[in-house]
């Protein structure tokens, strides 16, 4: 669609995509992917006077990060975060649990517990060391599994990415679009 409008674009696969069997994606961080995107900008600047970054979800977050560093002339963020990674995960859990009809009290208790647990993961604590005693019994098994999956370099870094802290540093034009019915990247 961009090419039909006379807009040049550079697309690339995620780091390690061509050799996915030997690459452990959980060891990469949002910062690593941001560096990958930043590496393309000097190449584009050789041919174009204005260079922007368009990204969806994590890519929208990366666009915000690059803009905050002054590396883009404009950005388009399609469902990128404008809050922290931790807040995003808690909000996604809240929306998913509410959508299946769980009582508000259960949702609130779970989200408060998972928020504290994610703080501990973000600070480097292992999933097996996190106390979830305040969690509703019915939700403990899925919580343990979720925390084990979150116990990775990628998630530890993601939890600490806080786009709200970057917004005041962005000086270029921004088009930020979010769908009202998209609960995954709200």
Model-derived features: where do they sit?
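Conserved alpha/beta-hydrolase
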Residues: 2-19
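Alpha/beta-hydrolase active-site loop
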Residues: 27-45
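Conserved alpha/beta-hydrolase "acid-adjacent" motif
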Residues: 184-186
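Glycine-rich "HGGG/HGxG" loop immediately N-terminal to the catalytic nucleophile
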Residues: 16-28
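Accessory cap/linker subdomain of secreted extracellular hydrolases
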Residues: 78-168
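Primarily recognizes the serine-hydrolase "nucleophile elbow" in alpha/beta-hydrolase
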Residues: 42-97
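Short beta-strand/loop motif that positions the catalytic acidic residue
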Residues: 170, 176-178
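Acidic beta-to-alpha connecting loop that harbors the catalytic carboxylate
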Residues: 180-182
């Amino acid at each position: 669609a961009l090419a039909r409008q006379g807009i040049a674009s550079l697309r690339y696969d995620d780091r390690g995509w061509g050799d996915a069997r030997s690459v452990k994606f959980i060891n990469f961080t949002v910062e690593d992917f941001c560096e990958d995107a930043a590496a393309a900008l000097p190449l584009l600047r050789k041919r174009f006077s204005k260079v922007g970054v368009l990204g969806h979800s994590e890519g929208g977050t990366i666009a915000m990060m690059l803009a905050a560093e002054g590396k883009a002339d404009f950005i388009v963020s399609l469902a990128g975060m404008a809050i922290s990674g931790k807040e995003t995960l808690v909000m996604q859990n809240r929306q998913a649990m509410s959508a299946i009809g769980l009582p508000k009290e259960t949702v609130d208790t779970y989200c408060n517990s998972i928020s504290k647990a994610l703080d501990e993961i973000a600070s480097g604590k292992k999933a097996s060391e996190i106390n979830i005693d305040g969690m509703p019994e019915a939700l403990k098994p899925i919580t343990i599994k979720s925390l084990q999956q979150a116990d990775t370099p990628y998630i530890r870094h993601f939890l600490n990415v806080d786009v709200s802290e970057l917004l005041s540093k962005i000086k270029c034009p921004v088009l930020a679009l979010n769908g009202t019915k998209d609960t995954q990247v709200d």
